[in-house]
Amino acid sequence: EGGPLDAGTVMFTDFTLRGTWMAATDSGTFHDFTFTPGVSIIVSCRDQEEIDRYWAGLSAVPEAERCGWCVDRLGVSWQIVPYNIAELMANAATRDKILHMGKIDLTKL
């Protein structure tokens, strides 16, 4: 109440997502832009089951699926990757396989 937006509009919130503190904020004015892959959210997954679950829930733009990246129904880019992605990408052969995948499939690495 008393802010620049309509009553009931969320301007700032924080929440916990699977044990991780997250925060979100909105602007009081309209902006004529959308989300781009320049900003993405990384989800570090323990195993293939977790990768599959996040992917199924988030990926909504099949043509945007590249090397573990997907785009949700709102246009937000996500990186759904194994917890050891840096180690995997350090190996040239493994990196080449990942770069040719949409959703990362650990069984093919």
What are these regions (language model features)?
Residues E1-G19:
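Core segments of cupin and vicinal oxygen chelate
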Residues L5-D6, E49, E65, I98:
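Residues at secondary-structure transition points
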Residues V10, T36-G38, R95:
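A structure-centric signal for secondary-structure junctions around beta-strands
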Residues L17-W21, D26-G28, F33-E87:
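Vicinal oxygen chelate
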Residues N84-H100:
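A short, polar/charged loop-to-alpha-helix boundary motif
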Residues K97-L109:
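Short, C-terminally biased terminal segments at protein or domain edges
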